[in-house]
Amino acid sequence: MAKNEHLRSVFDWIQIQFDKTEFSPKEIIEDILFLDFDLFIENKGSLKYYNYDSQLHYGNIRIYYGSKESSYMLVMSGQALEFYRDMILDPNSLSERQFLDNLYYNYNRFSIRRIDIAIDDFNETPYFTPNQLLKICQKKRFIYGKSTYYNTYGDETIGQTLYLRKPNDDERLRIYDKRLERAEKLGISKRYIENWIRTELELRKEKAHYFIQEWLYSEIDLLNFTKGYLKEKVRFYSDSHFSKPLRSWEKFLGHSKPVSIIISKPKTELEQKLEWFTYKGSGAILKAYKFLYDNNLLHEYEKANYLALNNMEYPPDLASGLIERAILFKREDLIPTIKENIKRRN
């Protein structure tokens, strides 16, 4: 019978983007990675989807850069992270949590662009195999958020991988037999490698950044936090009515508390302007102006200027923001008034 004590969770990919105006390669290497800058070798290097043309690398730890990009990109693959844990973090009694906490607590102008988090099942009889879950998917008895897309790669001989959600989605789940993968890679029989089923969550862009942020805020270990996220997002069922959760998946997730990641939406242009006016612009002057007017402390020409504020017209971009706000609050009746007060270009 599968037991939770034979599960472990590790990061299998971490990719972080740093703004050039706030960071230097030396600072990334020495203050964030806790490494010696002289260990890194400079070489040519490129990264898909970006215009980097150079890299600094130490083993598989890589920092990409280039004159056409305004950032540096730290990429740590599974091999790089295994090396980093064994050779840098563990000898210094540090963890990946402390490494990331140092980054989030002490720095700004960076973003996590991708993380892969693996849950490894080393049970002699695993909670499930990729093929078992594939049969559930083929019957359309699963849902991942709002998606029911799945795909597979390989077979049971070389190792089968089950993918949930599309390749271009910001999050994806992979379930595969790590033992078969390693046996194939090493050219040895699988009987020489322990049983090993890997469930791997891949998050990109804002989802990756906010997942790490919420995990650091919590007091939950990576295994249970990741299981909690999967409990909230991914469901398998043993019946076509979606009324009976698949027992093996439920047991795998155990008593983990469901985790929901809320991504803050960027402020609209109107919100940014109002915030700037209040805290960095002329908000205090407007308040003073009103105080002087209400208490009859203005000269006549100043009164005329104050009253003229009500007759000012909106620049087109500001008017556009006002119309969007009126629609948001279901006050479409105000749109004609806004349009009547748009400043016309000469």
Predicted regions located by residue number:
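Structured, helix-rich domain cores that form ligand/interaction pockets
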Residues: 1-268, 276-346
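Residues in the recognition helix of alpha-helical DNA-binding motifs
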Residues: 273
